[in-house]
Swiss-Prot record:
EC number annotated for this UniProt entry: 1.1.1.1
Family, as annotated: Belongs to the zinc-containing alcohol dehydrogenase family. Class-II subfamily.
Obligatory cofactor(s): Zn(2+)
Name of the gene encoding the protein in the UniProt record: ADH2-1
Upper taxonomic lineage: Eukaryota, Metazoa, Chordata, Craniata, Vertebrata
Binding site for Zn(2+) 2: 99, 102, 105, 113
Primary subcellular site in the record, as a coarse category: cytoplasm
GO cellular component: cytosol
Name recorded for this polypeptide: Alcohol dehydrogenase class-2 isozyme 1
Assembly notes: Homodimer.
Length: 379
């Protein structure tokens, strides 16, 4: 008695209301339709973007919703027309689709797809499948998808263009982090900023994304990597991953960007903002050297009005770049998994807690209290 073509009943964490704990519920997961895949999630990381959507300050959220966008699992069944994966394959769901047909997918300049970011905020897109319906039901009510993934469910349904097939021997409890946090930070340094050997770098924010950016800077051969965070407890981990200096803005007697400029004789070659917020964005620009300083922005801060910048700061030679998912896509993610298996980088260092899925609210509390970098939930 297989499950193919049948509704599956399983456990999922549902956000019914903003500002309230998630609720573990039994949900019904419909079979995949054309060009859809039903995936059994084995492990999922908890990312700050998941908490943004249930913050009362967030505008436009679709509720109730099953969150989670950093997961890994095994294909349970496929719908008609699916050719890129088959039942039994290990996969990482990706919140950026890769249709391979649109002008974005065909361009070497971006990892975007026309199916992604059609509006102003990707966090509230892909909330339904292509036919504008959900595959989740709970207590007779339709439940929204999140980012096209909804990894906080034992089973989920995603579009075939939102999947990367990975090696059969991949450790799902670690490579799930490649679904967002690690790839976003590491790629911001490697792919977007294009950090060069011998360069100086500043990384703002030492969560999972920021620490991954430090790993990227180190891999690229940076000679000096300055890590900045208001939580000094994160400095030991940052140094273990490659940071040469650590600064806490709250412990300085002048703006952190001024300190960085003094430390580096005029500013860093590459500045990467993994925290977000107008103050951090301004510091990112100000700490970059004139002439060629590169500023890459990754972090998002809720309800922040963003950066106000003078043309003078730009005509002095600085460049500003934005990045999403570190420039990776469904074709390049499998290479990241292979690089992890071959020891090119250490995903283990990012995992501070491993908890059973039903402890998800405990994991959220650890994140809010700044006590975790990445918590991996095991299903």
């Amino acid at each position: 008695m297989g499950t193919k073509g049948k509704v599956i009943k399983c456990k999922a964490a549902i956000a019914w209301e903003a500002g309230k704990p998630l609720s573990i519920e039994e949900v019904e997961v419909a079979p995949p339709k054309a060009h859809e895949v039903r995936v059994q999630i084995n492990a999922a990381g908890l990312c700050r973007s998941d908490t943004h959507v249930i913050n009362p300050k967030f505008e436009g959220a679709f509720l109730p919703v099953i969150l989670g966008h950093e997961g890994a699992g095994i294909v349970e069944s496929v719908g008609p027309g699916v050719t890129n994966v088959k039942p039994g394959d290990k996969v990482i769901p990706l919140y950026i689709p890769h249709c391979k047909k649109c002008k974005f997918c065909l361009s070497p300049l971006t990892n975007f797809c026309e199916k992604f970011c059609k509006g102003k905020n990707p966090l509230i897109e892909q909330e339904l499948m292509e036919d504008k319906t959900s595959r989740f039901t709970c207590k007779g009510k339709s439940i929204y998808h999140f980012f096209g993934i909804s990894a906080f469910s034992q089973y989920t349904v995603v579009k075939d263009v939102n999947l990367a097939k990975i090696d059969d021997d991949a450790n799902l409890e670690r490579v799930c982090l490649i679904g967002c946090g690690f790839s976003t930070g590491y790629g911001a340094a490697i792919n977007t900023a294009k950090v060069t050997p011998g360069s100086t770098c500043a990384v703002f924010g030492l969560g999972g994304v920021g620490l991954s950016a430090i790993m990227g800077c180190k891999t690229a051969g940076a000679s000096r990597i300055i890590a900045i965070d208001i939580n000094s407890d994160k400095f030991a981990k940052a140094k273990a991953l490659g940071a040469t200096d650590c600064l806490n803005p709250r412990e300085l007697n002048k703006p952190v960007q001024d300190v960085i400029v003094e430390m580096t004789n005029g500013g860093v070659d590459f500045a990467i903002d993994c925290a977000g917020g107008s103050e951090v964005m301004k510091a990112t620009v100000d700490c970059a050297t004139v002439g060629w300083g590169s500023c890459t922005f990754v972090g998002v801060n809720l309800a922040d009005k963003g950066l106000t910048i003078s043309p003078i700061e730009l005509i002095l030679g600085r460049t500003l770049k934005g990045t999403n998912f570190g420039g990776w896509d469904a074709e390049t993610v499998p290479k990241l998994v292979s690089d992890y298996k071959n020891g090119k980088f250490d995903l283990d260092a990012l995992v501070t807690h491993t908890l059973p899925f039903d402890k998800i609210n405990e994991a959220l509390n650890l994140l809010d209290q700044g006590k975790s970098i990445r918590t991996v939930l095991i299903f």
